[in-house]
Amino acid sequence: MGMAFSKLFDRIWGKKEMRILMVGLDAAGKTTILYKLKLGEIVTTIPTIGFNVETVEYKNIQFTVWDVGGQDKIRPLWRHYFQNTQGIIFVVDSNDRDRVVEAREELQRMLNEDELRDALLLVFANKQDLPNAMSPAEITQQLGLQSLTRRAWYIQSTCATTGDGLYEGLEWLANALKKAGHE
């Protein structure tokens, strides 16, 4: 009975659900971000082989976030998570200048997939607390984001360990999903 009321209230008050795919190269901070959003604390992580999935509630939206491992050997498995994805969070280690070209190649490969043609793109320029971190403007240029004329995208500087920028990113995603009619 309680569940019936809950579903009724969700319909009346308009709770939305959105499927988000969070990907990026290994060690970019995806799992740390997921659990900082979910639990509000830093958890000890190990490299993700497979995926983690959690629901994160923000502003009456229930984001189902799929955090998929980023090691090169398992990146081909990303495509199995594309179906019904409304938003992509692509996490970049802003301090890893040696692999930014690799990140660009993976992002471009994914954005060319037909199943993701309508998905919004949020880039988290993570690890901004490190002294050698690339700025969001530099990452925008390195990833070629300015050439994405047919896709809504946004880049947000973040620090997964402090939580800086994470909710600002979700705010953009929530507003962009509403504008795009994905609600």
From Swiss-Prot:
SUPFAM superfamilies: P-loop containing nucleoside triphosphate hydrolases (SSF52540)
GO terms, molecular function: GTP binding; GTPase activity
Lipid-substituted positions (N-myristoyl glycine): G2
UniProt entry keywords in alphabetical sequence: ER-Golgi transport, Golgi apparatus, GTP-binding, Lipoprotein, Myristate, Nucleotide-binding, Protein transport, Transport
Listed GO biological process terms: protein transport; vesicle-mediated transport
GO terms for cellular component: Golgi apparatus
Keyword presence, Metal-binding: no
TM region(s), chain numbering: none
Domain of life according to the entry: Eukaryota
Keyword Metal-binding: no
Function in brief: GTP-binding protein involved in protein trafficking; may modulate vesicle budding and uncoating within the Golgi apparatus.
PANTHER family: ADP RIBOSYLATION FACTOR-RELATED (PTHR11711)
Protein name, UniProt field: ADP-ribosylation factor
Organism: Ajellomyces capsulatus
